[in-house]
């Protein structure tokens, strides 16, 4: 594009592992996620009590990491390689975000199967925006992003096709 303010960019990549229970299983998942991403892991907590799954409100049931900048770009390249650079059109939302899953953590380089730990899957969410989005998030003189500048599903799909050579089905 000719206008640099219209070029989409990856704002952040959020990697989430939903374990569904606290305890040693969650600690193992945190260790795996920290090894794969190289960053400190944050726990995610249950929003409500679910007796069918024996989950209480406020109980830690998952872990996540937010990656930005070069770390996000590198991790995204690796993750897209694992899913064979194929995404479904339904994985893109109207705001320009993309979510996809990796079924086994052992697909990442340097990770091997450990029978004591098992296999964990993870959800990867990519937030795509344009330069100038800070206007809507800053504390002072906050403004809305005009509709013409907002990123759409089609913009994100073309961005992923051009930059990452992703096949969208």
From Swiss-Prot:
Disulfide bonds: none
Pfam hit, one: Ribosomal_L5_C
Keywords: Ribonucleoprotein, Ribosomal protein, RNA-binding, rRNA-binding, tRNA-binding
Keyword rRNA-binding in record: yes
GO CC term, one of those recorded: ribonucleoprotein complex
Single GO BP term: translation
One Gene Ontology molecular-function label: tRNA binding
InterPro entries xref list: Ribosomal_uL5, Ribosomal_uL5_arc, Ribosomal_uL5_C, Ribosomal_uL5_CS, Ribosomal_uL5_dom_sf, Ribosomal_uL5_N
Membership in a protein family: Belongs to the universal ribosomal protein uL5 family.
Subunit field text: Part of the 50S ribosomal subunit; contacts the 5S rRNA and probably tRNA. Forms a bridge to the 30S subunit in the 70S ribosome.
Function: This is one of the proteins that bind and probably mediate the attachment of the 5S RNA into the large ribosomal subunit, where it forms part of the central protuberance. In the 70S ribosome it contacts protein S13 of the 30S subunit (bridge B1b), connecting the 2 subunits; this bridge is implicated in subunit movement. May contact the P site tRNA; the 5S rRNA and some of its associated proteins might help stabilize positioning of ribosome-bound tRNAs.
Name assigned to this protein: Large ribosomal subunit protein uL5
């Amino acid at each position: 594009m000719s206008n640099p303010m219209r070029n989409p960019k990856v704002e952040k990549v959020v990697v989430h592992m939903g374990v569904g229970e606290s305890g040693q299983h969650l600690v193992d998942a945190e260790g795996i996620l920290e090894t794969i991403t190289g960053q400190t892991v944050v726990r995610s907590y249950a929003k409500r009590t679910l007796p069918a799954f024996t989950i209480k409100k406020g109980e830690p049931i998952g872990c996540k990491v937010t990656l930005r900048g070069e770390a996000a770009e590198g991790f995204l390249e690796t993750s897209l390689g694992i899913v064979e650079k194929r995404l479904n059109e339904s994985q893109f939302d109207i705001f320009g975000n993309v979510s996809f899953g990796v079924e086994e953590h052992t697909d990442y380089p340097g990770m091997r199967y450990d029978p004591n730990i098992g296999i964990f899957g993870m959800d990867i969410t990519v937030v795509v925006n344009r330069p100038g989005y800070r206007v809507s998030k800053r504390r002072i003189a906050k403004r809305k992003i005009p509709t013409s500048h907002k990123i759409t599903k089609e913009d994100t799909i073309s961005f992923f096709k051009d930059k990452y050579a992703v096949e969208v089905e």
